[in-house]
């Protein structure tokens, strides 16, 4: 087995070990969960505000009620939180928690270190 294949298998084995103790399990439940994570983290990394309504609209092939359920669950699990601005108290922005940012950055670092 070549090194790249071995590294990739070890990576996924480690991800499976973490799956019930981290956000891995939650964001891999469905493509919608994973897409939400990517949208929120992309907005965070680009220093952009992403409103809950924008997120619901951008989630591919996910109904608005289902999107709302996923968002609420992510907030309950402290992966994300909602923030209001002083300009418009009706508009809520979704932001990643510090703990999730750290976990996501570790995930990216591990992915970058895989040799292909």
Where are these regions (language model features)?
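Short, cationic-aromatic polyanion-contact patches
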Residues: 85-108
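A short, conserved structural fragment
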Residues: 75-85
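Short acidic, hydrophobic short linear motifs in intrinsically disordered regions
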Residues: 46-58
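Amphipathic alpha-helical dimerization/coiled-coil segments
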Residues: 19, 105-116
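Short alpha-helical segments that sit at the start of domains
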Residues: 8-39
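Short helix-to-turn junction characteristic of helix-turn-helix DNA-binding domains
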Residues: 40-44
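Phosphate-/nucleic-acid-contacting segments
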Residues: 53, 60-64, 88-92
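Short amphipathic alpha-helical interaction segments
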Residues: 61-76
């Amino acid at each position: 087995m070549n090194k790249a294949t071995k590294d990739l298998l070890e990576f996924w084995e480690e991800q499976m070990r973490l799956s019930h103790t981290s956000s891995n399990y939650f964001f891999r439940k469905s493509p919608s969960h994973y897409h939400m994570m990517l949208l929120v983290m992309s907005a965070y990394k680009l220093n952009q505000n992403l409103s809950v309504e924008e997120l619901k609209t951008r989630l591919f092939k996910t109904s608005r009620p289902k999107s709302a359920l996923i968002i609420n669950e992510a907030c309950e699990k402290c992966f994300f939180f909602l923030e209001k601005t002083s300009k418009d108290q009706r508009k809520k922005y979704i932001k990643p928690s510090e703990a999730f940012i750290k976990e996501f950055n570790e995930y990216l670092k591990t992915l970058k270190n895989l040799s292909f």
